[in-house]
Amino acid sequence: MSNIMLKVEDLHTAYGQSEALHGISFEGHANETVAIMGRNGMGKTTLFKSLMGVLPLKSGRIEVAGQDVSRDESFRRVAKGIAYVPQGRMIFPTLTVEENIQTGLENSKTKRIPEEIYALFPVLWDMKRRKGGNLSGGQQQQLAIARALVTDPKVLLLDEPTEGIQPSIIKDIAKALNEIRKLRGITIVVSEQVLSFAMDVADRLFVIEGGRLVHETARDKTDVNHIKAYLSV
């Protein structure tokens, strides 16, 4: 499979003197979803913050659609095609749903929200005049993803998108992510602890442990019990 959208090579990230990521390497292709599985404290969020430029790299290289973004500030990475939905559903509680999505259109020539966004997340259409702070957790997560998508990314990073969300909404999010990927041909990278969700969306699964990728498998070859062993304390 060619058409690499995200290439991560030998990534090392440190908090002060303490190294947190030890030589992480992986690729994400167009129209592919990759899951990074792991328990809390194993490096998932550190990896995403490093990919986004929130944390500086100690060494290594990150490419988006062939462009080196390793030394770029976060906003330049966004301009080159990375979108990031951090853990905890970062939305603007006092803005309406529609206004929240429009904040992702700041650099766009038009302020019009593409119709496909509401087609992917019908609940947002129904609630577009409602304040973000009045949505449920699952609705806020869909809003955060919608806002990231209007930046027209090549790579979409989702840090634990199912955290604290009821199972029926998790299914909706999985369905939307699968549609987005096909529709746009983008790479989606999710960090996750819920294996059933990862199996619904990911083509390939990695396990991160102690800041290293220790296991990789294609979805159809996944040994569920093997991965569950990594996820249980």
Task: Explain the meaning of each model-derived region.
Residues 37-39:
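The feature captures the beta-strand-to-loop junction immediately N-terminal to the Walker
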Residues 150-154:
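A short, proline-enriched helix->beta-strand linker immediately N-terminal to the Walker B motif
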Residues 171-183:
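Helical segment within the ABC ATPase nucleotide-binding domain
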Residues 60-68, 80, 110-114, 119, ...:
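Conserved ABC transporter NBD signature motif
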Residues 95, 135, 148-149:
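ABC ATPase signature
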Residues 68-89, 114, 126-129, 221-227:
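ABC ATPase NBD coupling module
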